[in-house]
Amino acid sequence: MAKKLSKNESLNFKNEMLAKFDDYLTGLIEGEQKAKAEKISFWILDWINYLDREENFSPNKMLKYKRGSIVKVHLGFNVGSEEGGLHYAIVIDADNDLSNPVFTVIPLTSVKPHTDLDKLGKNQIFIGNEIYEKLTNKLKKLLSKLSSIQLPEATEEELAQFQNELAYAKRIKAEIDKMKTGSIALIGQVTTVSKLRIFDPRNRYGVLKGLRVSDD
């Protein structure tokens, strides 16, 4: 067990740690690794945000994430070959209770131009374009619904709902525009994470809400 520090010792330790951290980031920037320094810095800011939210976080206010659900989660800045950053992922819990503050996911990565699908590692599985196609179909259905609304005859409440759903459709379109059409499941990097790390979907207007991969 670590030695219990006095208040002054804690402050000194904090200052030493920050100085070392500053030196490390400065070294990265000056050593032509500016991008890495920025990723670490952004992750620290995100991590502080998670810690600030942690005390009042209630998973009961989130959605229920079923097996096969597609989510976007922040995996953090990790070491070595551990997957990190903001990633799509597949929920694999058989029955994750709404009150459960964590869930288990398989991270996904996109197919790159240089990726040879015939030479994937044994812990990688190509799952095709299913996520892209399902999100595209979701957008088509929403746009079809919106196009059927008779705006001149709509009430104020209906117009407000129309504006909300139109904004929702635009966010879905923006997500589709950023997506690659092929995904690879990194089954060797299954991980359990806090639902605090969920970027999307967190409510019924989440872009990925309702998206699930097929069982096969």
Where are these regions (language model features)?
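Loop/turn positions that initiate beta-strands
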Residues: 68-70
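Residues located in well-ordered beta-strands
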Residues: 88-90, 104, 186
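C-terminal terminal-subdomain/extension
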Residues: 1-50, 54-55, 63-66, 117-216
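Short, charged beta-turn/beta-strand-edge "cap" motif at the junction between a beta-strand
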Residues: 74-82, 96
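Short, surface-exposed secondary-structure edge patches
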Residues: 60-64, 80, 94
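Short beta-strand-centered aromatic/proline hotspots
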Residues: 84-95
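Short, conserved beta-turn/loop elements at beta-strand boundaries and strand-helix junctions
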Residues: 94-100, 111-112, 192
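Short solvent-exposed strand/turn elements
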Residues: 103-119
